[in-house]
Amino acid sequence: MLSLSMSAQSPATFTLSSNDVGGQATMRQVFNSFGCTGENISPQLSWANAPEGTKSFAITVYDPDAPTGSGWWHWLAFDLPATTKELPSGAGTPGNPGMPSGAIQSRTDFGGPGYGGPCPPPGHGAHQYIVTVFALKTDKLGLDANATPAVVGYTLNGQMLAKASIVFYYGR
């Protein structure tokens, strides 16, 4: 009688975390325009257990509750090298040295590149802000800082190996 025993280890789960946002945004992350008076500082983000074959990462922040019929893109950053495992607070400010060399921040729904914090309409209730890190199978998306959120999203989904998200809330 032949008996085989195989132990299969499942890969660790791709995860995203933040020391800055844990359920609720602080005034550090809130936008500083459109009637909001926050500091507009992107949150610290760190991720672990990217799948094998990851060649780059991308970060997005999206508000599906914005009263636009199509949500609101607050941040799109891509072409982050595969060696990147963390972004410090403030990395979303264009020109901030916390953003890895070669990474691109493209246009948001605010009209320009870089992080734009939460600023929902007054009395609209708390909105959810979905922060996602994408592990990608390409080192470069082939897009530039003028790429629209729709084009970035389409391209990310076509190159995605895995994604991990956290959600925080803010209302005024």
Short names for language-model regions:
Residues 8-172:
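N-terminus-centered regions that define maturation/targeting leaders and the start
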Residues 1-5:
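Bacterial N-terminal signal peptides
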